[in-house]
Each structure stands twice: as C-alpha cells, then as structure tokens.
C-alpha cells in the first residue's frame, strides 16, 4: 500500500510542499526567513485574535480597552507585547528576506517576486492600520499625517481623504474601519503567501551560487525541516527576550498618552520599520513629489528584475556588485536613523543625499557595475 501522505488529496499537497520537496543541497541560513515569516504571521494572527476579543474600536474606549487588556486580562500584557514586538520581528525577517532576494538574484523568478512585493505592501498597510488602533497620540497623529498624504493626488485627493476618514477628520469612523481592515488583511496575506509558495514550487528554490541545482537536490524533510526549526527557536528566543525584558524598546512613549486632536506631538514619526520610507518622503520639499518618492521607494523592487544586466544571477562571484549592495544596506540604515530625527540641519541634507543615493544605486550604479563585471570576465 502506498504511503497515505502521497495519496490523500490534502496530505499530498503538504507532502509535495514540505516533505518530499526537492531542495538545493547548498541553501544557507538566508533561506530560513520564508518559514520564519510564516511563523511570524501565525503568531500575529493568534495574538491578534485574542486581543480582538477584548479590544473595542471606539474612540472613547479604545485606549482604555488596551489598558484593560494589559492590567486585567490574564496574560493580556504578554499577548499585547507579543503582538507589538511580533510586528517588529516580522519586518526584520521581511527586510532580510528581501535583501537575500536582491543579493542572490531570486528576483529572476518574476511571479514569485511580484507576489512578494504585493505581500510587502499588504504587510505594511496592515502594520500601519494596527498602529492606529491603541488610539494614543502617535496613533492619531500618524494616521492623520499619513492619510493626509493622499490629498496630494491631483483633482480627487481631498475627496479621497475624506472618503477614507469617513468624515472631515480622523475619528470614530476611521478607527472602526481600520480595525475591520486590520482584522481581515492578515488572512489575505496568508492566502497571498500560499500563492507565493505555489509560484516558488513551480521553479524550485534559487541557491547561493545562482546556478541550476537540478543535478544536486535533497528532500526538504528532514534536512530543511530541522534547519527551519532551529531558525524558529532563535526567532522565539529573540522575540521573548524583547517582550519580557524591554517590551517598549521599539515603541514610542507618546503612544502612552491618549489621542488628543488639540495637542500635536513635537515629533510625529511612524514605527521604526517605516522610518526609511518616511525619511525619503520628508527629503522632498514638494508634497506630491514626496508621496511619489515614498511609493517608488517600495515599488522600485518590482523594477529590479528588469535592471539585471549581469550574466551571472547571484552576487556571490561579483565583488563590485557586493560592495554596492552593502552600501545600499548602509544607506537604508542611514535613512532609518534620519527618519527618526527632527527636521533640522544637518539631518535634512543627510536625508536628501541618502534618498538620492538610494535611487541612484538601484537604478543606475548597480546595472552599470554589472555590465562592467561582464566585461572583466570577457563575457
């Protein structure tokens, strides 16, 4: 009798995705982040579900309901901080996952890559709406500032903003709809992640060398299941350390003050994982230009596959491209730092230079360097 896992309609899907899947024998720990993102999503959905049981999406009671969760619900503080810091871990894994894709040329799998870019947008939208829900000062003003950016769209801008707000300012209607979207989006993300995997398994995984690995495959289980479990344990270790020792390390103290439309905080800034995009937005003095640059800072990822001029897929054997890649990483860290600083000298000019360098590296310097490397190898 054939093994049940290979014949049962449901189990054979699991079998071909996680057990008997042929995987390259040389994929490094940089390939762990896909499974870690799956674990992050599960943690977020579960903790979010339990938070939603006690949260009320009303401007009068939202802040106090979060306080109630932390003070009165059994382990409510743990669930709340797991959810808040789980989002940070989610984005750390996301950035490393995207960075891996850029470094090793995984973007050459176009469908997988484009679904990934879509997933990134969906996760960013979900995180933004989630940040509004506790209804603290930074929640309210962050929502006001970011939604207001849409008013820069010609002709329909102001109507669009009022339509999203459900009124003439960020108020009860806005909070209620943000809660509804924040609840449904993670399930859409889970479905998209399934499509992401579907497309990936059409081609098989890339590997550090960027070469075809068909001649040397190993079964996913037990080799990569064990490797993924190690990654998950490390993720949980870091997350629990953060939650139990310094849960507010990555948060904003302003969010412990209830939202007050009459009092603007001195420095309005989003969560740390949006700071790089926020810095790019602020570095352009024109409102519409800033909004376009903000959108393009993420959308540029969709253009990357068409800018691949190298005859090699991976950067493993391309030292000049490697150098530019790490300059890009340093540039993004600089932008993240600038996004959290006040708008004054010298931060303004540093932010503008870092923003120019970001687009210059991806659109111009990397493709030219790849062509140069082709010539060095007489290709």
UniProtKB/Swiss-Prot annotation:
Residues bound to a ubiquinone: 201
Subunit: The cytochrome bc1 complex contains 11 subunits: 3 respiratory subunits (MT-CYB, CYC1 and UQCRFS1), 2 core proteins (UQCRC1 and UQCRC2) and 6 low-molecular weight proteins (UQCRH/QCR6, UQCRB/QCR7, UQCRQ/QCR8, UQCR10/QCR9, UQCR11/QCR10 and a cleavage product of UQCRFS1). This cytochrome bc1 complex then forms a dimer.
Summary of the function given for this chain in its UniProt record: Component of the ubiquinol-cytochrome c reductase complex (complex III or cytochrome b-c1 complex) that is part of the mitochondrial respiratory chain. The b-c1 complex mediates electron transfer from ubiquinol to cytochrome c. Contributes to the generation of a proton gradient across the mitochondrial membrane that is then used for ATP synthesis.
Keyword Zinc applies: no
Annotated GO MF terms: metal ion binding; ubiquinol-cytochrome-c reductase activity
Keyword set, alphabetical order: Electron transport, Heme, Iron, Membrane, Metal-binding, Mitochondrion, Mitochondrion inner membrane, Respiratory chain, Transmembrane, Transmembrane helix, Transport, Ubiquinone
Membrane-traversing stretches: 33-53, 77-98, 113-133, 178-198, 226-246, 288-308, 320-340, 347-367
Gene3D superfamilies in UniProt: Cytochrome Bc1 Complex, Chain C
Family: Belongs to the cytochrome b family.
InterPro entries assigned: Cyt_b/b6_C, Cyt_b/b6_C_sf, Cyt_b/b6_N, Cytb/b6-like_sf, Cytochrome_b, Cytochrome_b_C_euk/bac, Cytochrome_b_N_euk/bac, Di-haem_cyt_TM
A Pfam family matched in the record: Cytochrome_B
Membrane topology category: Multi-pass membrane protein
Protein name (Swiss-Prot/TrEMBL): Cytochrome b
Principal place of residence: mitochondrion
GO biological process entries: mitochondrial electron transport, ubiquinol to cytochrome c
Cofactor(s) recorded in Swiss-Prot or TrEMBL: heme b
Cellular localisation: Mitochondrion inner membrane
Positions of heme b b562 binding: 83, 182
Miscellaneous: Heme 1 (or BL or b562) is low-potential and absorbs at about 562 nm, and heme 2 (or BH or b566) is high-potential and absorbs at about 566 nm.
PANTHER family per record: CYTOCHROME B (PTHR19271:SF16)
């Amino acid at each position: 009798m054939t093994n049940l896992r290979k014949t049962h309609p449901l189990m054979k899907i699991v079998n071909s995705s996680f057990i008997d899947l042929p995987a390259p024998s040389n994929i490094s720990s940089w390939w762990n982040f896909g499974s870690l993102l799956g674990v992050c999503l599960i943690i977020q959905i579960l903790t979010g579900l339990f938070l939603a049981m006690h949260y009320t999406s009303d401007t009068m009671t939202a802040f106090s309901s979060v306080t109630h969760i932390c003070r009165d619900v059994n382990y409510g503080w743990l669930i709340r901080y797991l959810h808040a810091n789980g989002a940070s871990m989610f984005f750390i894994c996301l950035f490393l996952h995207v960075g891996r894709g850029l470094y090793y040329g995984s973007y050459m799998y176009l469908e997988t890559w484009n679904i990934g870019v879509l997933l990134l947008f969906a996760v960013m939208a979900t995180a933004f709406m989630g940040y509004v829900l506790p209804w603290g000062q930074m929640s309210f003003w962050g929502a006001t500032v970011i939604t207001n950016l849409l008013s820069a769209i010609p002709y329909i801008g102001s109507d669009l903003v009022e339509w999203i707000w459900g009124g003439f300012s960020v108020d009860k209607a806005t909070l209620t709809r943000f809660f509804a979207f924040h609840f449904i989006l993670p399930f859409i993300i889970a479905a998209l992640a399934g499509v992401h995997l579907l497309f990936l398994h059409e081609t098989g995984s890339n590997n550090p060398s960027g070469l075809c690995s068909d001649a040397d495959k190993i079964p996913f289980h037990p080799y990569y299941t064990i490797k993924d479990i190690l990654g998950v344990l490390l993720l949980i270790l870091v997350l629990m350390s953060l939650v139990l020792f310094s849960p507010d390390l990555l948060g904003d103290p302003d969010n412990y003050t209830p939202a007050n439309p009459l009092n603007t905080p001195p420095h309005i800034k989003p969560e740390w994982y949006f700071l790089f995009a926020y810095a790019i937005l602020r570095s352009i003095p024109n409102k519409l230009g800033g909004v376009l640059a903000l959108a393009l800072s993420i959308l540029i990822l969709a253009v990357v596959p068409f800018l691949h001029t190298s005859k090699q897929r991976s950067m493993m054997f391309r030292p000049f491209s490697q150098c530019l890649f790490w300059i890009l990483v340093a540039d993004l860290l600089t932008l993240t730092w600038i996004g959290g600083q006040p708008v004054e000298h010298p931060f303004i000019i540093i932010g503008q230079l870092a923003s120019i360098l970001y687009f210059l590296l991806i659109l111009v310097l990397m493709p030219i360097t790849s062509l140069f490397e082709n010539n060095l190898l007489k290709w």
